Amino acid sequence: MDEGIGEQRARWEKGTRFYEALVERDLFGDWVLTLVWGRRGSSLGRVQHRPHPSAIAAHEAVETVARRRAHRGYARIR
């Protein structure tokens, strides 16, 4: 069902702040959205892993994150 839909990486930045989203399979073959955010040049920050039932659901979650980041003034880097 998820053929043709693979891993995805996106990054947003605003000033010294960054936000990353990564869609990939975990060791069990399940799709996981990993969110990483913090300040550039700092070891402080947060990581959050959100499991999703399919690659499509994970990619839709990235689009939701993208809309939220744009609304908050972040520029998409990749």
What is the meaning of each model-derived region?
Residues 1-32:
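Short N-terminal "domain-start" leader segments
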Residues 62-78:
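C-terminal structural segments of small proteins and small subunits
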Residues 23-48, 63, 72:
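Short aromatic-glycine-(Arg/Gly/Cys) micro-motifs in beta-strand/loop hairpins
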